[in-house]
Every structure is written in structure tokens, then in C-alpha cells.
Amino acid sequence: MTTVLVTGASGFVGSHLLPELLGADHRVVALVRSAEAGAKVTRRLPAELLAKVELRTGDVDRPATLAPALDGVDAVIHLVAIARDSSGGRQLLAVNLDGTRNLIAAMQASGVRRLVHLGALGVADREELHYGKSKARAERAVAESGLDWTILKPSLLFGPGDGFFNIVADLVRLSPGIVPVPGDGKSRFQPLHVADLALCLRLSLERPETVGHAYELGGPRTWTYRQITAEVCRAMGRRRAIVPVPVPLIKLVAGAAEAVHLPFPVATDQLRQLALDNVGPIDGVHAAFGFVPRRMEGELRYLRRRRAQQGPTEVA
């Protein structure tokens, strides 16, 4: 039995990863920032699995909390990340990059060598974007750490509790018969179900041959943004016209909302990302891990229900 520290255990990916690890007879140490986050972890798990979970309070932003969190641990799966901020990228760098560096330093000091890191597809080519810069630099820090690392780089994730698809669903709910898409709606994505990512994370942990490798992961089909929006409408049973809107216009509205601290579905940095392709090898999951991930068609029924608010460890 491997004892695995999971950072971001209370977030979207963590909520699917913990049952995957526990079902394979691993013991989990869930790193949580607060008692509230810990309660969220335990509420989601069936009673028969709780005995194999230990909650430890800590935060990658607070290096002094990481050494106690690593005590008795064999490996780490690092999920913590944020996808937006309103500080010109400073918070993204603080959490995504500095938090990863803090974890690496703590692992080096404690002697825990095995690290599976959740990266993001396409960020190496997008360092002009705040999110891309923070994630690309974090991935480089992992690769240069001297630890026994594996990096998984997924495209958009879907599944109960997700960020992106629920945002599109909210736009559909709020729209008066039309749904805006940024630009021409032709940017391409390769949506991957979060449960399939969780399986890839577990298999990475268990297979020594994955050490020293980074894997680009996506679903079995490429979708344009416009096609994704249409599929969300179908899943929700809503008829909507899909209308392209120039990215500069949406950025203007988003920037104005950010300036006065009004809620807006996406930040300006995220809008720039949505106008760019986010695809990898179409058989990336099968080539690396030996299974075919599920298709998105028919899997979005959860969008009929409004999601609960996610915490700051959410990977959007």
C-alpha cells in the first residue's frame, strides 16, 4: 500500500482522484487548507473508504506546513492550481509557480522523491498569457527538480463539478435565446473526462516507466468551441442561437467588470486562451496508459443541475 499526499484534495480533480486511489488500495493523505475544506473531502467519500484517508492541514503557500504534511508519505500528487486572478497574474504565479516550488523544496528536504504533477496542455507555447506563464514555469521547475517526476497535461476537463462547461451552461441559462462565443468559435479543444484523468494519475503513480515523462492528454475527439457550446445546449435541452462575438469586445466588457470587481464568467486572460487551439495527440491517453477515454457525447447531463461553488484549488 502506497501512502500518497494529494494537494488540492478538496477541488474538482481531487474529488474524483481520491476514490480512484482508495479503490486501488492506496492510503491517502489529503492536504487541505481549512476544516471546511476537510469536511468537503469527507462528505464526498463513502464511509467504507474514510478509514484510509487522513486529513492534514497545510498550504503550498505556507512552506512551514509542508514538512509535517509529508511525514510518512511515499509519493505526492500535486493538483493545486488556479486559473484566473484579478492581480495582473501575480496570484497565478504565487499559487501555480511558487506553490509548486515550495512543495518541491519540502520534498527534497524530507526525502520524498515521487511526484506526479498536474500540468496543462499547450502552456509551453503561451507564456505571454498569465496562466500559461505560471503553469509552464511550474512544469519546468518539476522537470528540473531532480525528483522522480511525471507530468500530465490535459486539455479541457469535463465531469460533475467542472469549471469550464458549467460556465458555458450558466451562459446558456442566462441568455435570451442566444449564446455568445468568443471570436469565430473555431478554436479547437480535446475535452477529457475527469474520471479518465484520475485513472491516468493513478496509473502514473503506479508505473515506474512514467518517471521522467510528460504526457499530453485529451479525449478521443476534437471539438471547436462552437461545437462544444452546441453540445452543452443539447445536454441541457435548451434551444439557443450561437453568435460569434469579437474577442476585443468581450475583453472590453470583462476588463470593465474586473476593474469594478463585478463578477464575470471568464477573465480577460482566459478569453485570450479560449481563442487558441488546445489539442494534443488524439490517441495520447491510449498510447500512454492503454485505455480509450470516454467520449463527451451523452456525458454532459450533469449540466442540467447548477453546480456548487468550487474552492480556490479548483482547476478550471
PLM regions and their residue ranges:
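N-terminal Rossmann NAD(P)H-binding glycine-rich loop of SDR-like oxidoreductase domains
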Residues: 4-26
